[in-house]
Amino acid sequence: MERGPNVRSLALISPTGLSKDAQERQPNEGLHKALSFPLWSQAFFDLLATRVSIRRFLNMSFQGEPDERLVDYSYKTAHQPGARFAPLAFVSGKLNSPDIRESIYEQLQHPVLVLYDEDPYTGFEALPGLMERHPNWQAKRIVPTRGLPHFDQPEQTFQALDAFWNEPPSDESES
């Protein structure tokens, strides 16, 4: 929003903050503090960052089996310096923005496309109301997918993005 003139449109892939209770979920500071405690935080991370655990989490986000190259990539990136802090923040909810719907989504003036389907980590119950209030919003369901349509159904995803980005700008979005 701060760079509004530099942005013509925005595509969101399986975004959080659109479930019916998204505004109620707050980061759990106590959980983050407990998980980050030096005595066991590395051991907890080591458990989360095994190939078996990574594959399990990716299986939840894929309609089919995740590509082994993605498992390998995820494993390698999880073992970079400082990487152990990201999963701890994710598990405790610190990566969520509980007010993103009001503070960001409701304020967007440019064309917005939401690509979604089933997602084990978030819901989309608030999406129809958001689209009703904001004609600059549109949604495309990419089926069958579970949170990562750009991996599960890349052709459908890219076609939807191309169609969206190639739409002529409306009079409303130009002003």
Name each region found by the language model.
Residues D21-R25, F45-E106:
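Conserved alpha/beta-hydrolase catalytic His-Asp/Glu region
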Residues S19, Y121-T122, L148-D152:
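A short, basic/aromatic alpha-helical/loop segment that forms part
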Residues D21-Q26, A126-P128, D152-P154:
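Short aromatic-enriched loop/helix-cap "lid" or pocket-rim segments at secondary-structure transitions
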Residues Q107-T145:
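Conserved loop-alpha-helix segment in the C-terminal half of the alpha/beta-hydrolase fold
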Residues R3-G4:
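Active-site catalytic pocket residues across diverse enzymes, especially alpha/beta-hydrolases
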Residues V7-S41:
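Flexible "cap/lid" loop of the alpha/beta hydrolase fold
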